[in-house]
Amino acid sequence: MCGIAGIVSNNSSLVQQQKLQLMANALQHRGPDGEGFFINEQQQVGFAHRRLSVIDLSNNAAQPMHYLGRYTITYNGEIYNYLELKLTLQQKGYKFKSASDTEVILAAYDCYQYQCLQYFDGMFAFAIWDNQTQQLFAARDRFGEKPFYYFIDNEQFVFASEMKALWANGIDKSINNTQLINYLSQGFVSNPTSGVTTFYNNISKLPAASYLYYLPTTKQLNVERYWDIDKESKTAITKIHEIQEKFGELLQQSVSRRLRSDVSVGTSLSGGLDSSSIVAIISKLKNPNSSLKTFSATFPGFEKDESKYIREVAARFGIENETTSPTAI
């Protein structure tokens, strides 16, 4: 995971490098491999980025990344189908200087604008400053795997991967009592896929499967949803063996895309059906000369401890397994 943060000023006050640094410091644990900053010529917009290198470890993939002299992005996540999308964009005439998925997002946005989100298979939260239209575009993945918090008032729009980065910028921490009461009485705050409120009065979250445009000249913020589950859709496949084949095909494709990495890959192994199936597929797909590391939590003495199944799966596929036994429960 990476850490992203940014400030867009909508008055005469200038974005300060010092504030961006404080925000980046608050996100250091999210990106140990480096940091980067961007402040535009007018000092109206500033981005901060903490990097965790996964795809294209070179400086060509460093962020914030610039594209076509027009766009600048700070991005957290991974686009699993970036190679397929990159090929499509190359056929349209786009050229790339890096091997990263970050640059693919920028090219896709230039090509499709907000509709680029329909092409992304992945988990992501990012913000793009368009120097030509002088507006900010930000988006979050379909299920909200990657976080995006923001603060807005008459002077600025501030965003970050975590609230603590907003607080580092001086944003107020006053509690949203309504949300707190809802949580204590009902056990939940709001719909996690559609709610924008948080436990803090001045901090909002971009909902899952949503994007926003912010235009500082008019102080206008527009948030739109770009995707939802089609509850009425029905598959044409009705035979059990065909359903099994299609499910296996989709699961293998999904796992395969998540193995795209320029660093070592590991996976959780709980001993259950889901994680064991993923380990089996990875063992089938991986290079025979490479090792697969798995990580497990075991609970000796508990009735539902699955250590036995973890050992069986590890032995069956000849994989490395590291276990830990939490005691503070």
Which residues are covered by each model-predicted region?
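Cysteine-centered catalytic environments shared across enzyme families
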Residues: 1-329
